[in-house]
Amino acid sequence: MTQTLSLRAVLCATTLVSPFLAQAATESEVEALKKELLELRQRYEAQQNALMVLEQRVRQVEAQPQAPQPQRLVKSIQPPAQARNDANAVAGTYGASLKDDGAPAPSVENIYQDASGFFGGGTFSLETGLTYSHYDTRQLFLNGFLALDSIFLGNIGVDQIDADIWTLDLTGRYNWNQRWQVDINAPVVYRESTYQSAGAGGSTSQITEKSVTGDPRLGDVSFGVAYKFLDESESTPDAVVSLRVKAPTGKDPYGIKLKQVPGNNNLNVPDDLPTGNGVWSITPGISLVKTVDPAVLFGSLSYTYNFEESFDDINPQQGVKTGGKVKLGNWFQLGVGVAFALNEKMSMSFSFSELISQKSKVKQDGQSWQTVSGSDANAGYFGLGMTYAVSNRFSIVPSLSIGITPDAPDFTFGVKFPYYF
């Protein structure tokens, strides 16, 4: 009888405790799922920010003018008698060919045209250019912590982005009185970017790759005005000041949505590629050119100010639309170089240029300004340029720019065809 009562008591106790144990297990599972969801959300937001920073760097670097390619300015304006005296005083030197009142050789005419951006070969000139840039970057995302010399606890993803950019430029220039010049530049941009990620399913050996292309579209159109305020002499260089305004006519990068690639929750790619910065900018600059027989030295300095702009949507998350403001970082750019005339038709140049950019800021509606980490840049380039004068009116100008800092494109190759009317 006693044993029967004890058995009944145990059964009753078990029946009463079981619901509480099941409820405790359910609450534990819910907390674990919430924790996992929070980690996934933080990882997704980190990748969104990383992609935005990389996209801003690509657009920021590709939007900059290439390293100056030396070609010919206009001849310094002097009275004929003074020009003849100068020529007699320095007869037989390379500098004399720039001072001579007679027409210089085509290669001398092409020596530093792009160095100052001032074209004096005719009243009107039209230039067509084609440029190809390649840019790649690798960024490591760690979710967890590093222990015991490279043993990773948590998820790991290695993301690499390869960007190929083709730009077709059409530039028209009008030179007035050998002192003033106005120009307009309209680019058409084609882009293709390939995104790679390792770490799918927690494995570092599985790599997912996804390519995104953007159809050829209009980029940011720019307008410029230049004034030649100083003529070259024995002690002074040719000097030109310029002012350029860029309009946001291209596809801006803000509000482009990210989508997850099937089979790899580490990889999110944009559904479109921009062709412009999306903001107005203004760039004052100065260029100097000086003959130092037998070479020509040139240099330039400019500063770009980006205006603050408002957008209806700056959120990259699918199904979410958030308005806000964007303030791209301003930047300085400087360049120096040397050029030589090889013969009457051909010249060659070597140059270095650097772009230093401040950090960008974003502000969602109802929130405060936030600095975008990693959006500053220091892009350095080494440039090789050549000019070949087909005739007095038509030239071919190929150039190669090699990136020497991580923020610069790996390389940029371009060729321009200026024609003078």
UniProtKB/Swiss-Prot annotation:
Coiled-coil residues: 23-64
Keywords attached to this entry: Cell outer membrane, Coiled coil, Membrane, Protein transport, Secreted, Signal, Transport
Effects seen without this gene: Deletion of the entire fapA-fapF six-gene locus shows no visible growth phenotype.
GO cellular component, one term: cell outer membrane
The keyword Zinc-finger is annotated on this UniProt entry: no
InterPro entries, A to Z: FApF
Gene Ontology terms describing biological process: amyloid fibril formation; protein transport
Pfam family, one: Phenol_MetA_deg
Signal peptide (residue range): 1-24
Superkingdom of the source species: Bacteria
Major subcellular site: secreted
Compartments in which it is found: Secreted; Cell surface; Cell outer membrane
Record carries keyword Transport: yes
Annotated function: Transports fibril components across the outer membrane. Upon overexpression of the endogenous six-gene locus (fapA-fapF), cells form large clumps during liquid growth, make large amounts of biofilm and produce amyloid fibrils.
Family: Belongs to the amyloid transporter (TC 9.B.153) family.
Record protein name field: Functional amyloid transporter FapF
Organism, as annotated: Pseudomonas aeruginosa (strain ATCC 15692 / DSM 22644 / CIP 104116 / JCM 14847 / LMG 12228 / 1C / PRS 101 / PAO1)
Gene behind this protein: fapF
